[in-house]
Amino acid sequence: MNDLDQPSWTAWRPQRFGHVDVRKVRDPLIEPLWIGERVTIELETSGPRAQAGPHVAILDEAGDRIEDFPAVEAGLVEVARATSLLIDGYLTDQVERGPEHSTIPAVAMPKVGDLTRQMLIGGGRRREEFTPLERSLPANPEVPTTLIAVDLLMVDGESLLDVPLLERKRILESVLDENQFVRRGIFVRPPLDPWLVSWRSIGFHSIAFKAANSRYRPGLDNDGWAIARIPSR
């Protein structure tokens, strides 16, 4: 592997969730927390690094390269609508598993309004209870895997770190299409009620609250981001 094929942004680690209660996140964008491996992905389709073809590097949370998902890399090249991208996302088999393989035990579901109250009012859990839900789970190359793009850190060589999250997501939508191997993460704004039961039924354990105006700080905690567990009963 020559120097031009080496990843450029290994020092940029995914931004971490903060230590605050979700109720303190101002003007949140709310999204299901994917079960999978948190990664950053760099793509270049023109320039010195792409002389022999598109350059794609998938990096784990330690900045080490993951080379076991060529179909995902090829899928990303197919749907990219910019000459270079740096993406925050997840490698997951959750899309292909579907609800029939949900790991959530079958229990009686509360009413939708009760779900929201339990999460926001009765959710006096400590942060350490959520730590396992944040932990990145290594992706398995033996099963169908999808890249879920949830944030955009750079486009066409221009850093977006100081661009508000909502605008970063809008830009992501404009520069990344979708296919079998690449999807954009979904997000909603309050009220949550129409979404909680649906998300839980298809296998999500937790949801992320991210301030719409938050900036991105690679490798650091951001108290504009928080996690809440979806109540199970």
Where are these regions (language model features)?
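Catalytic cores of nucleic-acid ligases and guanylyltransferases
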Residues: 1-233
